[in-house]
């Protein structure tokens, strides 16, 4: 039987998507659209400036652009900076217990620029990276977040390496080396959620994917069984050792997980664990016209892993607020919105907002969503007012924007343009000067070269 590491390498070096390729590429294109949008929106965040300053004296060779800076950088460095920007606002898409696009897209954009890859090849590389990530994460029955792992950093490095190895057309042997090297570069801790280090995880993952491939091309060796070995990647990451290291990976390329799991597009720039709660609170608050002064208590029922990510119960900064169920509830009630405008230090500490934090209680349940084990099967919100009225959201499983409750193309375009406006990035399609960035991404499969994307 072919081992997992070898099976992954075989798929990456010679992928086959069958009759479902076009549908898979459409999902990948959504990943590019959403990531480039959030990258543009987040490029002015302090963490991006810190990373840019860190690299200020090491900008050669000039291989790939950082579009929002208008500067050229070494490929891995460009991927690092753009991935940090894409994840800085925590507004980027979600799947596979993490944020696949914010690791995959920056790595593909950077190396694709170096290689003069076409838009079609970029989309195929995304699918390759996604499928490798999906194969690995599907083998664990427990929740990575409860072990302290941030899957975006842990799986992102391997997924990015797979995508870049495909772009580079590495043979099977070199691909295996690259994937195994990337396995030793996997990192990212939940304890750093709500700080600048969380988007740093995405930056490192994208850069590590490129570095692993280039090290392999230079002849660096690595274990031929790194993923399935008892002292290897999957066992080391596993919370209780119940990970399946021996299952054949014979469905790779035959059953495309990108079509089963898809991508969930965030409507709110906060941890996805809070999105069900926000939908529930907004539904009740809007229907009943509830005001903050009327609230006696708000009770949330959610998953154990979700609650572990929402670790800030009394946030005092906009960053901390992104990982706070209490803030999500308060913002939804006070502002009837949980958006970028609310994610500020001043709003998080406003008396009418912070006054609600102590009125929020959280109950965890052990149910698991079979589509994403980081989530409970459903969440629920109940609100009680000072005059004794009680309101119940009912079971909430798929928030709007989820892959199984998707926003439409018009909604995705609105988010894209809003992100560009937030980042103060001019979009030529608005001015009518040319087809514009949005339209170039929307027709990415027809673009002869990625170098034409950010013209």
At which residue positions do the language-model features occur?
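Terminal-appendage/accessory-domain detector
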Residues: 1-98, 190, 194-207, 214-455
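Function-dense linear segments that define catalytic or interfacial modules
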Residues: 77-95, 103-118, 125, 132
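Glycine-rich, mobile lid/loop segments that gate access to catalytic sites or pores
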Residues: 113-211, 223-230
């Amino acid at each position: 039987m072919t081992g997992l590491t070898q099976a992954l390498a075989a798929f990456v070096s010679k992928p086959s998507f069958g009759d479902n390729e076009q549908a898979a590429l459409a999902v990948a294109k959504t990943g590019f659209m959403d990531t480039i949008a959030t990258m543009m929106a987040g490029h002015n965040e302090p963490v991006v400036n810190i990373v840019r300053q860190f690299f200020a004296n090491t900008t050669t060779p000039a291989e790939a652009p950082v579009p929002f800076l208008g500067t050229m950088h070494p490929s891995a460095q460009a991927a690092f900076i753009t991935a940090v920007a894409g994840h800085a606002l925590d507004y980027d898409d979600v799947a596979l217990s993490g944020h696949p696009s914010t690791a995959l897209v920056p790595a593909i954009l950077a190396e694709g620029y170096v290689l003069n890859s076409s838009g079609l090849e970029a989309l195929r590389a995304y699918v390759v990276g996604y499928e490798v990530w999906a194969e690995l994460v599907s083998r664990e029955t427990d929740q990575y977040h409860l072990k302290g792992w941030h899957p975006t950093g842990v799986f992102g490095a391997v997924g990015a390496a797979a995508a870049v190895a495909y772009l580079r057309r590495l043979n099977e042997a070199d691909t295996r080396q690259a994937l195994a090297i990337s396995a030793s570069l996997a990192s990212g801790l939940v304890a750093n959620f709500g700080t600048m280090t969380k988007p740093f995880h995405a930056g490192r993952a994208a850069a590590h994917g490129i570095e692993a491939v280039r090290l392999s091309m230079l002849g660096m060796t690595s274990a031929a069984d790194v993923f399935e070995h008892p002292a290897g990647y999957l066992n080391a990451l596993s919370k209780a050792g119940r990970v399946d290291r021996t299952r054949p990976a014979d469905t790779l390329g035959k059953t495309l997980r990108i079509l089963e799991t898809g991508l969930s597009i965030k409507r709110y720039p906060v941890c996805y664990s809070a999105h069900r709660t926000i939908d529930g609170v907004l539904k009740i608050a809007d229907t009943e016209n509830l005001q903050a002064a009327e609230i006696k208590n708000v009770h949330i029922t959610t998953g154990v892993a979700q609650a572990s990510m929402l670790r800030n119960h009394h946030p005092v900064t906009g960053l901390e607020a992104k990982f706070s169920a209490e803030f999500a509830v308060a913002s939804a009630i006070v502002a009837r919105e949980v958006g970028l405008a609310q994610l500020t230090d001043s709003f998080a500490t406003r008396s009418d907002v912070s006054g609600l934090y102590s009125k929020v209680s959280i109950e965890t349940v052990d149910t698991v969503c079979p589509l994403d084990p980081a989530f409970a099967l459903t969440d629920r919100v109940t609100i009680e007012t000072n005059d004794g009225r009680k309101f119940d959201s009912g079971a909430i499983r798929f928030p709007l924007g989820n892959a199984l409750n998707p926003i439409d193309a018009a909604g995705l375009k609105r988010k894209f343009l809003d992100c560009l406006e937030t980042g103060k990035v001019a979009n030529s399609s608005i001015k009518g000067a040319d087809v514009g960035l949005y339209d170039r991404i929307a027709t990415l499969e027809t673009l002869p070269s990625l170098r034409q994307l950010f013209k």
